[in-house]
Amino acid sequence: MKSYPSDTWCTYPFTALVLHNGGSYGPCCSANEAVAMGTDDKEVVLEMYNPNQKTEFKPYAMSAYQAFNSKFMKDIRQQMMEGKRHTACSSCWRQEDLGIKSKRQGMNQVYIEPGVGHADGGFEYDIDEMVKNPRLRSLDLKFDNKCNLHCLMCTSGSSDMWVPLDNKMHKYLALQNVTKEDDLDLYMDDAHKWQWTPGEFPETLYEEIKRLVPQLQEIQC
């Protein structure tokens, strides 16, 4: 078993971003906080599932490069190096406190220990290199929330099939029905993996992705 920098360390903030279909960025799709460009052109942090969220921001105004190097992401990386629990990752902390294997723990294995429970796939990155030189290697794009599934761990922000369920459970879940945005400002510094969520997409998607990110090695669907 590999030795991690701390008990709260996660590969995602050091290697990945998710671009939400509302135009903000997070370290992963499970994070409950995101970063975006405010209306005053300054970085703002958003609470993803707070129905009383009042912070105004400009969707897609921040590039992936800016997001990955934002104060928000740097704070997450720093707190994890210090063994602290960042509030953006509360979903994983709750699962781990209950004795459930969290996404953080599972993805650490995928990225660092692909031979542990992952016979197919995996990356086996070098931890020291990731810590010393965080680089954007994986960008998870959500083009819209059109989907024919309503997976238990998902939300209406990623699947419109959840909207009717949210309406029934509005006292417990934040309503999120996000419309499609076509103009994406994308920049990946050292990318090799691009993951998209089921939804509408242009017929020339793959050609456009390769044009935007020529160093891409893998497109995962």
PLM features: residue spans?
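N-terminal pre-triad scaffold of radical SAM enzymes
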Residues: 14-22, 128-157, 219-220
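A detector of helix-start/N-cap boundary segments at the beginnings of structured domains
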Residues: 5-8, 138-142, 195-196
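Radical SAM/AdoMet-radical enzyme domain recognition
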Residues: 203-221
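Accessory C-terminal segments flanking Radical SAM cores
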Residues: 1-117, 135
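Canonical Radical SAM [4Fe-4S] cluster-binding loop centered on the CxxxCxxC motif
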Residues: 27-32, 133, 141-194
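Short microdomains enriched in Cys/His and/or Lys/Arg
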Residues: 49, 109-127, 168-203
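Short boundary motifs at domain starts and secondary-structure transition points
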Residues: 124-133, 210-212
